[in-house]
Amino acid sequence: MRRKVFEELVTATKILLNEGIMDTFGHISARDPEDPASFFLAQKLAPSLITVDDIQRFNLDGETSDNRPSYLERYIHSEIYKTRPDVQCVLHTHSPAVLPYCFVDTPLRPVTHMGAFIGESVPVYEIRDKHGDETDLFGGSPDVCADIAESLGSQTVVLMARHGVVNVGKSVREVVFRAFYLEQEAAALTAGLKIGNVKYLSPGEIKTAGKLVGAQIDRGWNHWSQRLRQAGLA
């Protein structure tokens, strides 16, 4: 079972790179299906180089017995797994269309059925609230990342002010699906704001559409996996 998780993490990384969601500094993790007090995350490498042999195992304090280099931002993952037992996968990216919503006052809200999983709006973690305006804006310490997890609350995504995006979900595939459509939703909202008054999803539409779209996760995964094969990347 763990081997399957490793393979999904590698495939997910390739999909996110191929679809333009992840850049050089993104990373995705999965909770250990055999030990919920642990999670898997690749060693500190450029994402395009990651293989199943690069996966490290961490406890919920972000510690590992693996002596290879680890991402400093592993605490984003550990603190979310610690506070959200329902979460099985965590992704951190600098998703291009979403990134502007990390530094403007306009909230990121769903405007189409594909973005219903967002909820009524995406929370933003503001590091200045506790740490002032001379930080590196980085999620590299347990205390900062505990605050990120707190800002996430029970939602599916949180933005890090002037930095990036954190997606969570109940599976690797679900998180990839959500990351792709969060990017699409942000691009659609930005375009809509340039045209006229935006009509956002209602609470009822968010609830109902979210259930319908959530059932299509494997379809998305299969499509993006095929695109990898067509590109010679799988």
Curated annotation (Swiss-Prot):
InterPro entries: Aldolase_class_II_sugar_metab, Aldolase_II/adducin_N, Aldolase_II/adducin_N_sf
SMART domains, per the entry: Aldolase_II (SM01007)
GO molecular function: 3-hydroxy-2-methylpyridine-4,5-dicarboxylate 4-decarboxylase activity; aldehyde-lyase activity; manganese ion binding
Catalysed reactions, as listed in the record: 5-hydroxy-6-methylpyridine-3,4-dicarboxylate + H(+) = 3-hydroxy-2-methylpyridine-5-carboxylate + CO2
Cited Gene3D superfamilies: Class II aldolase/adducin N-terminal domain (3.40.225.10)
Residues reported in the UniProt entry to bind Mn(2+): 73, 92, 94, 163
Name of protein: 3-hydroxy-2-methylpyridine-4,5-dicarboxylate 4-decarboxylase
Cofactor: Mn(2+)
Keywords noted in UniProt: Lyase, Manganese, Metal-binding
Active-site residue list: 73
Gene Ontology cellular component terms for the protein in this record: cytosol
Natural source organism: Mesorhizobium japonicum (strain LMG 29417 / CECT 9101 / MAFF 303099)
One annotated GO biological process: vitamin B6 catabolic process
